[in-house]
Amino acid sequence: MDNKEKEDEELSDELKDQPGPSEKPRTPTVVAFTKPSFYRVNTVISDVKVCRSMSYDMCGNHQQELLFDLYKDETTGKVYLPRFFKALLESGIRKDDPRIDKMIQNIKDADLLDDFVWGTQHIYLEKDTFKRYIGSSIGVVTKALKKQMIIPDWERFVSDMGEIFEDVRSHNEGDLATYIPQLSRVAPDSWAMSVCTIDGQRKMWGDALKPFCLQSVSKPFTYALVHDDIGPEELHAHVGQEPSGRLFNDISLDHNKKPHNPLINAGAIVVASLLKNKLPLADRFDFMIHACRKFVGSGYIGFDNSVFLSERETADRNYALSYYMREHKVFPKDLNLQDTLDLYFQICSIETNCDSLAVMAATLANGGVNPMNGERIVNNRACRDTLSLMYSCGMYDWSGQFAFHVGLPAKSGVSGDMIIVIPNVMGIALYSPRLDKLGNTVRGVKFAEQLVQKYNFHNYDSLIYSDNKKIDPRRQLKDDHDGQNRFMYATKLGDIAAIKRFLLMGHDIHCKDYDDRTVLHVAAAEGDVVTLEYVLSKWQEDPNPCDRYDRTPLDDAKHFNHTACVKLLEEAITVYNLKGQDD
C-alpha cells in the first residue's frame, strides 16, 4: 500500500468517528485547473465595492463546477468524497444535517456508499456526477466552504469550547433533585454539552445523546407557543413579566394578583392553562409534543411517563399554588384545574437530549426559525419576549446575578438541564444533574461564566470604546482590500485550504498588493513548492509578472536560492510562452 492509499484510509476512518478539529491540516492535493465559464462585475453597495458573480443568472451550475475544480484529486481528476465531506465537517456541517440529506441519499442510491457517507471505501466522483449529487445542497455547501457561517473559524471555536467543557468537569459540588423521586436516581456525574448556531453548525461533547426531562426548561417554549397563539395582551392579562425575588415554587402573587412571570411554577401553570384550552387534554398534549418536535427538527423528543407519575404524586406544593391562584381568579373561566396540572406535569416530563435541546435553543436565537430546516415555529415577537424573560427571570433566584455576570438569556431546570441563547449567533444546551441551593446546575453556571470570560458574548461587551481583550468568533464584514491581504497571508502560510476558500468566494488570484506583488511572488519568496504549484495550476496570465521594483517571482526564487521553485516557474514560463506562440 502506497502512502496516498494509507492516508486516504486513515482519513476515512477518522471521518467515520466524526472527530473534533484536527491538530494540523494535511497537505492538500494539487489539482489541475479548468477555468470556469463565468464572468464577474463590480457592484457598489453603500460605498463599498463588492464583487458578485453574474454566472448564477446565466447558468445555475457554476458553483458546482468551481467546487469540483477546487476539490478534485490530482491523480484521478475526480473528487474524493471523504476529503470533501471532511471540509464540510470542519465547517460545522455534520453528516446528519437534514440540509444535505438529499445529497447523501443520492449517493447512497447510486450504491456508492455504505450506511455512513464517511465510510471506508475510496469514493471518487467525476464532474457531472458530482455536480448532479451536490446540486440539491449547493446553498449550504457553498456557504460552509466559503467560511460564511456565523462562526467562520469553527475548528478553533469548538477547540476552545471543548477546553472550557473539560475544565468545568472538575466541579463536583451540588446535589441531585430529591423532591421528585425519579430525578434523585440519575447518574450524578453525567456531563454533556451541545452547540447549534443559527447557520446549523453543530458540535456535541460528553453524554450529549443521554435523554433527560425538560422540567423547567420547557417553560420558555410553552410561553413562546402560547404567545404566538393568543398574543401578548391576552397572555399577560393572566401573568406578569417581573422577577419575583422569591423561590420558584413560592406561594405568592404580584401586586396585580398575578404570578410574577411565566418562568416560575405559578406562572408556568397559568401559561399551561392557556395552551389550546378549548381542546381536550389529550389533544393539548399532542399539540405540545408536536410543537417540541418542530423545535428540534429531526432531533429526539420523547416522554418519560415514570417522571410524570412521580411528579403528580408528589405535587402538593403545585396543587397549593393552583388553589391559591384559583381563589384569586388568576385562571381563565371554566378551567378544569386537574387537567391543567396534568398538562403542566406532562410538559415538564417531555424528554430530549442535549444535542436536540441545542437546536431548540438555536431556534430561539434565530428569531423563532429552526436553523436546520428553515421552518418558522413561533413569530419574532414571541421569540423576543421569551428571550427578555429568560434574561431577567430564567435562573430562579440567581437570575439577577446571572444577568449581571453572564449577560445572556438562559433557563435551567431541576433535572440538571440548561440552555443559553446568544441571539443571532447560537444556542447552547448543557446537562449536569448536580444542582446548587437555588436549583441551577452547578457545572452549567460555571460554564456560562467561563464562556463570557473568553468570548465577548455578554450583552454589553460590544459597547464602543471597550478595552476588553475577549474574542469575537462571529463573522465580520470585510472589505475587498482586507480580503486581498488575507489571501496573500494565506499564501505566505501555505494554507491551501484557505486559498481554495478565497477562490470560491470570488477573489481574483491575479490580484496585486500596493507593491504590485502577486501570490506568485509570495509563494516563490517563501520557497513553498506545494503552494507555488497549486497557485500556478490556477494561474491564467503570464506567470512572471513584475512588481513595482521590476522583480518577478522567478527573481525572488533565485534570490532566496529556492531551486525547486525556480524549476517550477521556469517550466510554467516556457509553457506560457509556447502557448502564446501557438495562439
From Swiss-Prot:
E.C. code: 3.5.1.2
Any one GO MF annotation of this record: glutaminase activity
Gene3D superfamilies with a match to the protein in the record: 1.10.238.210, Ankyrin repeat-containing domain, DD-peptidase/beta-lactamase superfamily
Binding site for substrate: S216, N265, E311, N318, Y344, Y396, V414
Key word Disulfide bond present: no
Region (Disordered): 1-29
Chain positions of ANK repeats: 482-514, 515-548, 549-581
UniProt keywords, alphabetically: ANK repeat, Hydrolase, Repeat
InterPro entries per record: Ankyrin_rpt (IPR002110), Ankyrin_rpt-contain_sf (IPR036770), Beta-lactam/transpept-like (IPR012338), Glutaminase (IPR015868), Glutaminase_EF-hand (IPR041541)
Short name of any one Pfam family annotated for the protein: Glutaminase
A Gene Ontology BP annotation from the UniProt entry: glutamate biosynthetic process
Catalytic reaction annotation: L-glutamine + H2O = L-glutamate + NH4(+)
The keyword Cell cycle is annotated on this UniProt entry: no
HAMAP family per UniProt: Glutaminase
Membership in a protein family: Belongs to the glutaminase family.
Protein name: Putative glutaminase 3
Organism, scientific name: Caenorhabditis elegans
Lineage, uppermost ranks: Eukaryota, Metazoa, Ecdysozoa, Nematoda, Chromadorea
Gene that encodes the chain: glna-3
